[in-house]
A protein has these predicted regions:
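Small disulfide-bonded, cysteine-rich extracellular recognition modules and tandem repeats
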Residues: 26, 121, 145-147, 180, ...
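Extracellular polysaccharide-degrading/modifying enzymes targeting complex plant/algal/animal polysaccharides
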Residues: 1-99, 104, 150-155, 159-161
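Short glycine/acidic-rich loop motifs that flank beta-strands on beta-rich extracellular proteins
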Residues: 20, 47-53, 92, 114-120, ...
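Right-handed parallel beta-helix
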Residues: 34-45, 81, 101-115, 124-139, ...
Length: 203
């Protein structure tokens, strides 16, 4: 960190995040976590160390490459014109939710976060994010739904194995999203993968 001309570091208050994830909600397809409501809570200050240790090649939506290389001889049996291979990774999130029902955020603040803010990753249903403020986020503010699994080859078409894995009935409404994707220009304000009956309204 390089202090600005008016800053005195001997008097500065410094916050160094230690955690990459502040909250994890994780059920199973058979027994989802149900009926959790967060209201008027501020979720702040996360880190994301992977880019520092392993580098970072960004893809669309804030996803990244785990590994990639050029094929010595172009072409594979399933794709004759392919010249390179690459494997996808999903970024860390301050709030990670898998296999949940009725997991809601209302009038919450998400700020000073290194990677993704909130991630409804898989098999989340009938949940609402509304009247929230997302700001100063390094990657995507809000990510919803299944994308290729970790380590999936990026050139291979992806389809979820089971419809149960889809996020369904998610409402994202009346949120203020600003100053996001500050560190990862491949990120977005709101990203939706394989979802069903999603409502994104007035953000």
């Amino acid at each position: 960190y390089y202090p600005r001309p008016h800053e005195d570091m001997t008097k500065a208050q410094v916050i160094i995040p230690a955690l990459e994830t502040l909250l994890t909600i994780s059920g199973t397809l058979e027994r989802p976590v149900r009926n959790i409501h967060f209201q008027n809570i501020s979720f702040e200050h996360t880190s994301w160390m992977r880019p520092s240790y392993q580098g970072h090649v960004t893809l669309q939506g804030g996803f990244h490459l785990l590994d990639a290389y050029k094929l010595p001889i172009p072409g594979l049996p399933e794709k004759a014109e392919l010249e390179n291979q690459a494997w996808i990774g999903r970024p860390e999130a301050a709030i990670q939710i898998k296999c949940g029902n009725n997991i809601n955020f209302n009038h919450c603040t998400f700020q000073h976060l290194a990677a993704t803010g909130v991630d409804y990753e898989r098999a989340v249903s009938t949940s609402i994010v509304e009247n929230c403020h997302f700001t100063d986020i390094g990657g995507t503010a809000l990510l919803v739904g299944t994308f290729p699994d970790e380590g999936f080859e990026t050139h291979v078409p992806y389809t979820p194995f089971h419809e149960q894995e889809l996020c369904t009935g998610i409402t994202i409404r009346n949120n203020l999203i600003e100053e996001v994707t500050n560190e990862d220009w491949g990120g977005v304000g709101i990203g939706a993968g394989y979802v069903k009956n999603i409502h994104i309204v007035h953000n």
